[in-house]
Swiss-Prot record:
Biological role stated in the UniProt entry: Probable phosphatase. Required for cell wall integrity and virulence.
PTM summary: Phosphorylated.
Active site: 61 (nucleophile), 63 (proton donor)
Source organism, top-level taxon: Eukaryota
Composition bias, Basic and acidic residues: 362-373
Binding site for Mg(2+): 61, 63, 338
PANTHER family: FRUCTOSE-1-PHOSPHATE PHOSPHATASE (PTHR43481), GLYCEROL-1-PHOSPHATE PHOSPHOHYDROLASE 1-RELATED (PTHR43481:SF4)
Descriptive protein name: Probable phosphatase HAD1
Disruption phenotype: Decreases virulence in mouse intranasal and intravenous model for infection. Sensitive to: high temperature; sodium dodecyl sulfate (cell wall stress inducer); Congo Red (cell wall stress inducer); dithiothreitol; Calcofluor White; salt stress (induced by KCl). Simultaneous disruption of CRZ1 results in phenotypic enhancement.
Assigned keywords, A-Z: Hydrolase, Magnesium, Metal-binding, Phosphoprotein, Virulence
Length: 411
């Protein structure tokens, strides 16, 4: 089991890339997760795909993450297709995770504010009515709770009295409160105190606003929070907020979710266990990922693309600050040699990104680029740029002295 905490780093020379390889994955042992937790048998060698993290708050998407209303949503779109020329396949493939108001603007081409507001209510009423019809005629739940959800929410709700009554978990959905406020009780799930809906924000997912508001409502830092999502649009929103992101393969194929590079990934939420850690005032989460995904990937910084760049806990804007971080900084996917104008290293604003178009090619700038590249590859923080430059200059002087010595010997 891997445990991610802030690690100290002191540079005695130039930092070197971390080239060590993770241990080979152990054979899959289905059903061993709960037993291993109870017996304390999870070890770094036998269970490298299981990780433990501590976070200040847990922020959930709703549809596709906690509940499944897909059959009812399909029927609602079929109803709207009678009035609007819609490509249902395209909508069902692309619209999941977006606010209803944004979806109707895009695909139904509705621009009149009053008509748009009334059609949002009509669409979400159609979902609720369809769910009721499905339950009545099939005997199945029109809105079903996904695996592991009820237990996880119950675990998160325990010991709330030790948190001054704060739940520290929230739902951040793209649905309106009109729909979400009914769907959660219909599914038999608890309604959280912090309930962010489409009505709460002016910009929905993939913008970070829903999760920033959710973290704020939980009195938590987004950088010390975990977003739980099932859709690419939502994953982008969570990553843009600066939070860690856990993807669940409950509505999309794993390959599609992996393209968004979530920090963690599970088949469903039955693979996540939670408990309150009173010593740190955080939730401890144990996440069992697929056996072939034992090294979580760090969240690429896309915030400058969507929202003004924000200081992340793994960025060099926090050098010298002694504050705990749950973010894994041990693996960075790209060095400066691979960067494009749409990438950044350790949270730098777009304009100052090493490798971005228009970057200054001066010696000073190249030293800074090299610093970012090496630090990002080694996954280490706490080194100042001045210290790096001094080390770089020292090594250059040493190489010149060696070169001059070799020339003297040749003469």
């Amino acid at each position: 089991m891997s445990v991610f905490t802030k690690s100290a780093f002191t540079m005695s020379a130039l930092p070197s890339p971390n080239t060590s390889q993770p241990p080979s994955a152990a054979p899959s042992r289905r059903g061993s997760f709960a037993n291993g937790l109870a017996s304390g048998q999870l070890t770094p060698v036998t269970d490298p795909h299981i990780v433990s993290i501590n976070v200040e708050s847990v922020l959930f998407d709703m549809d596709g993450t906690l509940i499944n209303s897909s059959p009812a949503v399909v029927k609602a779109w079929e109803l709207f297709a009678e009035k609007y020329p819609l490509d249902l396949d395209d909508i069902l493939r692309s619209a999941h995770g977006m606010r209803t108001i944004d979806v109707l603007k895009k695909w139904c081409k509705i621009t009149d504010p009053e008509l748009l507001a009334s059609e949002v209510i009509r669409f979400e009423t159609a979902i609720l009515n369809s769910a009721e019809d499905i339950a009545k005629h099939s005997g199945k739940a029109g809105i079903e709770v996904l695996p592991g959800v009820a237990k996880l929410l119950a675990d998160l709700g325990e010991e709330a009295d030790k948190r001054d009554g704060e739940e520290k978990w929230a739902i951040c959905t793209s649905s309106t409160y009109f729909y979400a406020g009914k769907a959660i009780p219909i599914a038999g799930l608890p309604t959280p105190k912090v309930f962010v809906t489409a009505d709460s924000v002016t910009r929905g997912k993939p913008f970070p606003d829903p999760y920033l508001l959710g973290a704020s409502g939980c009195n938590a830092s987004p950088f010390e929070s975990l977003v739980v999502e099932d859709a690419p649009t939502g994953i982008r929103s969570g990553k843009a907020s600066g939070a860690l992101v856990l993807a669940t393969c409950t509505s999309h194929e794993r390959e599609e979710l992996e393209r968004e590079r979530p920090d963690f990934l599970v088949d469903d939420l039955s693979h996540v266990k939670a408990s309150w850690d009173a010593a740190t005032n955080t939730f401890n989460l144990i996440i069992e990922q697929p056996i072939d995904r034992y090294t979580p990937r760090p969240t690429p910084d896309v915030t400058p693309v969507i929202t003004p760049a924000m200081s992340r806990s793994n960025s060099f804007s926090g050098v010298g600050q002694d504050r705990p971080s749950v973010r894994n900084t041990q693996t960075i996917m790209k060095g400066s040699d691979d960067l494009t104008g749409n990438d950044s290293v350790v949270g730098s604003p777009a304009a100052s990104r090493p490798g971005s178009p228009g970057a200054d090619d001066s010696v000073e700038k190249r030293a800074e680029m090299e610093f970012h590249r090496r630090a990002s590859q080694s996954g280490q923080a706490g080194v100042t740029l001045d210290a790096f430059r001094r080390a770089l200059a020292g090594n250059a002087a040493k190489r010149r002295a060696q070169s001059q010595g070799e020339m003297s010997q040749d003469e």
